[in-house]
């Protein structure tokens, strides 16, 4: 195989991610020609509606997957937090890259952190997961929907439309963006989204030539952790329309630790728990933890959220 086409979204961050994979491929295979195919997804077109109200899964991947299925592209680069639980039957994940910082970042031009924000401060985010955890910490905060690419969000902050905004740390680091006050929120305060910080390479199952190309990029520990998180999410049948968080780490030798959270969007109820299992049980730990949270009351929260939506 001498040439490969990578499908990607067109945002600056998505383009950075696709170019990163392109560079890794060309370092490993100097003979390989790599082209990028930019595709606009439904999620890119709808910028005036919070994600929780758009509905549907795969908002940022469906059109890209169609390019894979038609053969227009050989592979696709995704942020793993955007990848739906169920992939089309013909597609699979060829690799999950080593995870970047999975946390969320607080950014402000006046205030050093969440606790220093004034009463009733305006905080920008369209993530119900972030909203719920912020309000659990500071019920007085006014959460304002904030969509658009990273540059747009940062520009709105610098124009003082918000007292602070919350974004994924990985994206900020990858693009080298700065604000007067920036601080990563610890997982004890803001548990990350499932898959946050990792990149996934999606390909057709039958394309053995493409699968083999990406084997060197698969990071074993990250792969196990992301699979456990996604299994947890699948057990809850959740998506970006529900305040769910899940984060797994290899906490000891051959031991995987998974922490999960389901919350009411107003932060008034937070159900959180964790499990440890041997890495060999990574595919079992997610479903087990989801059942524990459902038994602890997450089922009522999820039912009420689906009724609202």
Swiss-Prot record:
Its EC number is 2.5.1.61. It comes from Lawsonia intracellularis (strain PHE/MN1-00). The keyword Transferase applies. Its cofactor is dipyrromethane. This is Porphobilinogen deaminase. Keywords: Porphyrin biosynthesis, Transferase. Pathway: Porphyrin-containing compound metabolism; protoporphyrin-IX biosynthesis; coproporphyrinogen-III from 5-aminolevulinate: step 2/4. The keyword Cell division does not apply. One of its GO terms (biological process) is protoporphyrinogen IX biosynthetic process. InterPro entries: HemC, Porphobilin_deaminase_cofac_BS, Porphobilin_deaminase_N, Porphobilinogen_deaminase_C, Porphobilinogen_deaminase_C_sf. The modification S-(dipyrrolylmethanemethyl)cysteine is found at residue 240.
